[in-house]
Amino acid sequence: MTISSNIATDFTDKQAVKVITGLNNFKIQQIKQMTQASEIAGATYLDIAADINIIEEIRSTSTIPICVSAITAEELVHCQQAGVQILEIGNYDAFYEQGRLFSSREIMEISQNTRERLPETTLCVTIPHILCIEEQIKLTQDLQNIGVDIIQTEGKSTSFSKQGDLSGIIQKSASTCSSTYAISKNSNIPIISASGISALTSPISFLYGASCIGISTNIKRLNNVASMVMYIYEIKTAIEYNRGVKKDINHSIRKSIINCQLGYYDLRMESHV
């Protein structure tokens, strides 16, 4: 497994920030604004749609590392040939809204096909939140075994939770942080937390085992580069401020549902040994 050198340091230091423009977002003006803001504010890398025209436009005006998201090996191979070195199978929200769901088997097939065709390219795979924790852990371990470099967790999508208030944001971030914690306790693969992430919730993601956080919806609501820059700075400041805070989170989750599920999973695994 190899993480591209231009993002590896931030992942190793567990302070990486990914700005996500959206798998189905082809609004070039907004994407260029987000790109400019990401570069000014020092985001680690940018995640864009698998569109060759957008890739060429961004690469011609920016030096920020680019990742593309898609759900087929063919699209990812095409983008890699266009010079993209970070590929992701994921960003499923647009598909959830259409009633399209992804099984562990389908994710494995896409991932294996992509990895076989592109053995040296950094590959990230999003774990669907619709899977139970036990399935998410098993899928992560299987993906790691075939050489996937990074895992991304997600929270409940907007099609499952339409709340736009603080409650809805916390619900999404709690879901992705729970998955991050469970997976980090059962694998050593770098993890991105990427749902409901804000200045409030980003430090929690790192406490729960993330190496990177992904931000998208909140930054897309802003309508100018200056506001986007300030938002990314706010996220990075929150992360940096909390990096020196050493906290033992085990006491707060010892009796939680997620911990009970992990205990049950461990017992199940032991019974099969």
Curated annotation (Swiss-Prot):
GO terms for cellular component: chloroplast. The keyword Aminoacyl-tRNA synthetase does not apply. Keywords: Chloroplast, Plastid. It comes from Pyropia yezoensis (Susabi-nori). Belongs to the ycf23 family. This is Uncharacterized protein ycf23. InterPro entries: Uncharacterised_Ycf23. Pfam families: DUF561. It is found in: Plastid, Chloroplast.
